[in-house]
Amino acid sequence: MNQPTSLYLASLLEVEWQKPEEFEFPNEFAKHWLEEQGSLSRRLKQHCQELTVELLQNHIVTAKTLKSDESQLLSEQDCLLREVVLCGDDCPWVVGRTLIPRTTLVDQQYDLAQQGDIPLGLTVFSADNVERDSLQMGWVHLPQGRFLARRSRLWMNHKPMLVAELFLSNSPIYAKERV
């Protein structure tokens, strides 16, 4: 994992998350992206020839390593930590960090622990019953600039996972207007 990617992932843990009604959106275009209720992967795929995943981490972390706000959203249990970079036509667009509780991994249509380089959203939103709640957004301030981020809890067949996404500078979220 290169240094900027490590910095991006670390910054996702430091975001001051806000509810949509409290967040100051830079523009309507970004608001539409951040409030997306469907699959971000599918949406990104519409803006490139090829959407690829660079898998950075995919392993179990203990409940005590979760931040308190993460534990509140998921319950206190060990989770599969999946960290990725989503790339559109080989250009990094989104850094993603997903926590999937062990109980969410069992009795599912799909083996989420074996996603590999398949975008998680494509699998999750193919399930029979998917909902999103606890949507939050925020800003990440880094030497490379100011980036939008969002976090939400996805329910796949009534079992939760927590997904955080950092939109990098070349992401389509910034296409209409630069932040």
Curated annotation (Swiss-Prot):
Its EC number is 4.1.3.40. Substrate binds at residues 82, 120, 165. GO terms for cellular component: cytosol. Pathway: Cofactor biosynthesis; ubiquinone biosynthesis. GO terms for molecular function: chorismate lyase activity. SUPFAM superfamilies: Chorismate lyase-like (SSF64288). It catalyses: chorismate = 4-hydroxybenzoate + pyruvate. It is found in: Cytoplasm. GO terms for biological process: pyruvate biosynthetic process; ubiquinone biosynthetic process. Belongs to the UbiC family. This is Probable chorismate pyruvate-lyase. It comes from Vibrio parahaemolyticus serotype O3:K6 (strain RIMD 2210633).
